[in-house]
Design a protein with these regions (language model features):
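Long, contiguous binding/interaction regions
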Residues: 1-200
Length: 200
């Protein structure tokens, strides 16, 4: 029988080695909501603005609950945990209603950037989206956010301007080979307010 809600995907666990020790990568769990306050406290205002495309300092408790309680049929998030068990970063994908595309996001603790954690989180997200049958990943990035554009560009994403919003670019990664007939980008998601953190 078909389960209405997928069970926790234990098979999606990875470990990455860094000079300071091993970081665990795994799907997010509801209990990870307890790790969010300390995590967000160590994300700078500028990194918060670049992530949410708007200045936001305080997140109510319900945001952490929403971010950690997922319907795995539609959404997936991966966390990276430091050797001490602290939250180091989160990557996330939300599938479009047709499940052909997914909108991704990434946030890494400011003091831990530059160590390959963001790249590792994006790679496992790409691996998951491909295995889940999505055709492409898409994400809006501020035009000034060269670091994020460089990261996803290195992973194979194309970067295209958004004609009616010069402050933002669209990054797209096709997950199927061209001979598989991958559809064109930009068709899966309705336009949403780029200041709404719940949609990113």
């Amino acid at each position: 029988p078909h389960l209405a809600i997928r069970p926790y995907p234990t098979e999606w666990r990875r470990t990455i080695e860094r000079p300071e020790g091993a970081y665990e990568l795994r799907p997010i769990r509801p209990a990870d909501a307890l790790l969010y306050p300390a995590f967000l406290d160590r994300v700078s205002r500028e990194d918060m603005r670049l992530r949410f495309l708007a200045v936001r300092v305080h997140f109510p408790e319900e945001f952490a609950l929403r971010w950690t309680q997922l319907d795995y049929d539609r959404e997936m998030a991966f966390v990276a945990l430091t050797p001490e068990g602290e939250l180091a970063g989160v990557s996330r994908v939300v599938a479009a209603p047709d499940h052909l595309s997914g909108e991704y996001s990434l946030l890494v603790r400011s003091d831990l950037q530059g160590r390959g954690i963001g790249a590792a989180l994006m790679r496992i997200l790409i691996e998951y989206a491909r295995a889940d049958g999505m055709d492409r990943l898409e994400g809006m990035v501020l035009a000034e956010n060269r670091a994020m554009q460089g990261l996803v560009g290195h992973l194979g994403f194309t970067i295209e301007p958004i004609l009616d919003d010069p402050g933002v670019v669209m990054s797209t990664l096709f997950l199927r080979r061209p001979e598989d007939g991958a559809p064109k980008a930009g068709t899966g998601f309705p336009q949403v307010s780029r200041a709404d953190p719940g949609s990113r």
